[in-house]
């Protein structure tokens, strides 16, 4: 992995965001996702690398592109593993709501946890709280610790939680402590990363979301120096999702064992979910969000707002790019 790869990966998420944004607000979530997938795959194919999708759009028989195990890139150069979500928050994009983005994590070969398509209990917090808050604690305990770490009163803290029935008890506990809740309907990657930046008004992410996106969040937080922990959820009674209506706890445990995951209750730290020597996170807004704006289409150009965090050079880059159209006559600042 090298510095050139950082710029190329930025362009990958930019192109995916632009493709998806053309369908923003049209109620076509599957089409928006497909457009992002195609654009991301096309740009990846131009990179000098031996790339491999380890977290993607599904198994080979479920997805035509960016499926798990697919090789991407020229086939020459460094080995790079990718966890991708070309249109994170497809519902958000379809309904023109905040928080949708094109996102990926990259690392050296073998450097990303091959998360199954399960759920994951997550805890994300700022760098000041790294190693101090713990997912094993109650929400009450973690809020007290976070309050001390950030030198803020508990009633000054805001916790992001997915708006799901399974979080009813968690939300009640957080509010009883005096902290504020910021509910989100979809897409917890941007919310997790926002915890790593002061001034976002977001101090913590708690609760259950998708496991693959947990790996992407972990990669970003590892590169940023923030706190992230995840624990796989395999009990349908805890996940409380219609997607698992026909699944059983015993069946899910068997699935995990077949994938080679025998310590099913293991709590993963960020550096275990993203363990490679080099880790890159890249995200580009499709719609406006906590960290950056969505795609803006103008007469002579298209504007993208993106974020790249890298351990390669210990940088965090917020990038605004103007993609000029042929024959552009006037570009405004």
Curated annotation (Swiss-Prot):
Reaction equations catalysed: beta-D-fructose 1,6-bisphosphate + H2O = beta-D-fructose 6-phosphate + phosphate; D-sedoheptulose 1,7-bisphosphate + H2O = D-sedoheptulose 7-phosphate + phosphate
Q: Which cofactor does it need?
A: Mn(2+)
Pfam families listed in its UniProt record: FBPase_glpX
Q: From the Swiss-Prot or TrEMBL record, give the protein name.
A: D-fructose 1,6-bisphosphatase class 2/sedoheptulose 1,7-bisphosphatase
Does Cell division appear among the keywords? no
**Which molecular function term from Gene Ontology is one that the record holds?**
metal ion binding
Q: Which residues bind substrate?
A: 88-90, 119, 164-166, 186-188
EC number, UniProt record: 3.1.3.11, 3.1.3.37
Q: Which GO terms describe its cellular component?
A: cytosol
Name its species.
Prochlorococcus marinus subsp. pastoris (strain CCMP1986 / NIES-2087 / MED4)
Which family does the similarity line name?
Answer: Belongs to the FBPase class 2 family.
Kindly state the subunit structure of this protein.
Homotetramer.
Protein's job: Catalyzes the hydrolysis of fructose 1,6-bisphosphate (Fru 1,6-P2) and sedoheptulose 1,7-bisphosphate (Sed 1,7-P2) to fructose 6-phosphate and sedoheptulose 7-phosphate, respectively.
Per UniProt, Mn(2+) 2 binds at 85, 88, 213
EC class name: hydrolase
Annotated binding of Mn(2+) 1, by residue: 33, 57
Q: Which PANTHER family match?
A: FRUCTOSE-1,6-BISPHOSPHATASE 1 CLASS 2-RELATED (PTHR30447:SF0), FRUCTOSE-1,6-BISPHOSPHATASE CLASS 2 (PTHR30447)
Pathway(s) per entry: Carbohydrate biosynthesis; Calvin cycle
- Which Gene Ontology BP annotations are present? fructose 1,6-bisphosphate metabolic process; gluconeogenesis; glycerol metabolic process; reductive pentose-phosphate cycle
